A protein has these predicted regions:
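Conserved beta-strand core positions
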Residues: 69, 101-103, 144, 170
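Glycine-centered loop/turn motifs
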Residues: 30, 74, 160-161
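Extracellular/periplasmic catalytic domains that process cell-envelope and extracellular macromolecules
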Residues: 58-63, 97-98, 163-166
Length: 177
């Protein structure tokens, strides 16, 4: 009986630790509505919050969204999860609010590998995303500008040769009409 109680106590005490050790679930793909909202330019670079209108001086930053687009390791092959995320993006880009705009598709990598390798890989991945949107959602190529950023513009600054999933991403920037 004592062994059973001790074993049960260990299992209960270890359950929270085991839960923490599990890999985090992939973040759900943003909805097309969320993407349209994030990528739609605000009028005159102004915003209204609780009745206060804030007008930004100078040029406002272009609306953009950072997406986790999964690729097979070391390749530009889209995973099923990536296609799900890009499905939301493709639907959003066909929305009338965004239909006349052009978009820069920025591919980013982490710092694993040489800078030249990461630059080439990020360019391939940006082109893969643009091609998928063109072929699957009939987004005209003229509306998409794939650009490889390599390991420049890290979301999470890391030393060289550090794998960091949050740095392997695609950023979509609205360039306007």
């Amino acid at each position: 009986m004592r062994v059973s109680l001790t074993l049960a106590a260990l299992l209960v005490a270890g359950a929270p630790v085991a839960a923490l050790a599990q890999a985090p679930a992939a973040a759900p793909a943003p909805s097309p509505h969320e993407l349209v909202k994030a990528l739609t330019p605000s009028a005159n670079g102004s915003a209204t919050t609780r009745g206060i209108r804030v007008v930004h001086g100078g040029q406002a930053a272009a609306p953009s969204v950072s997406l986790t687009v999964d690729f097979a390791t070391g390749s530009a092959t889209l995973t099923p999860q990536a296609k799900k995320v890009l499905g939301s993006l493709g639907t959003a880009l066909k929305n009338p609010k965004l239909a006349g705009d052009r978009f820069r598709i920025e591919g980013h990598t982490d710092t694993v590998g040489t800078p030249a390798y990461n630059q080439a890989l990020s360019e391939q991945r940006a082109r893969a995303v643009a091609s998928y949107l063109e072929q699957t959602y009939a987004i005209p190529a003229a509306r998409l500008e794939p650009v490889g950023m390599g390991e420049h513009g890290l979301a999470v600054p890391t030393p060289d040769q550090t794998p960091e999933a949050r740095n392997r991403r695609v950023v979509v920037v609205n360039k306007g009409a």
